[in-house]
Amino acid sequence: MTLDLDAHKKDDKLLITTIQQEYKILAEYKMIESEKLSGIYVIPSYANSLQWFGVFFGRQGLYAESVFRFTILLPDRFPDDKSLPTIIFQQDVIHPHVCPYTHSLDVSHAFPEWRCGEDHLWQLLKYLQVIFSDPLDSIRGIEVDKLKNREAAELLMNNKEEYVARVQENIKESKEHIFDTPPTEDPHYIVFEKFQQDVHGPVLERIKAGRSKQTEPSAQQGNGGHATGLSWVKEGEFKPLSIE
């Protein structure tokens, strides 16, 4: 009987710990939403909240027009564990901070360890955004042999023309796979559809109309003078059309 009670207590403790962790992860997601990071979309997996799906859209600099899919893997005891979350790209990405073999992004230069309550996932994504916006600046003050891709770093510093050419190859490849069949059946995997006038046309017009109304004085006053982004998601699926 005593053994049964101890087992139940352990099960209850594990359940409570799991629920608390889920709330913390949900809070991280809410913070990302509130930060409105331009060009980055992420969502936790439906099956496993420790795995997130993401897409990075390059908006400026050498990586403009890139579309890089990535996965975020959170440590089992996130966010209490000091271990860092892992970001892994789904394709080759040439960058001094991206390992050419595992496609993983080295975030240790910005986050030596994870500090619960101080470090957040939105900051991790902001770091991703910044290092792709200006890769050269992202390696200033760091010894070349401490970078994940030494060859990329040396090209960036000494042969920028060749570096740009390789980046363009990455960008071309990324665009060729935008509409690929999802590698998973997880309903939260981010899916993109080719534009279809009969399906997406009406939604696009609603987005345009909404943006037009937000520029009117009355609309801005009703929202405290702040414009908000608009998005529509196909019912039952995660296929967004949005405007920031």
Swiss-Prot record:
Database matches in SMART domains: UBCc (SM00212)
Name of the protein in its database record: Protein crossbronx
Pfam family, one: UQ_con
Renumbered residue ranges of the record's region Disordered: 209-244
Residue span, UBC core domain: 20-176
Name of the gene this protein is made from: cbx
Coiled coil ranges: none
Native source species: Drosophila simulans (Fruit fly)
Annotated PROSITE patterns: UBC_2
One GO BP: defense response to bacterium
Sequence similarity: Belongs to the ubiquitin-conjugating enzyme family. FTS subfamily.
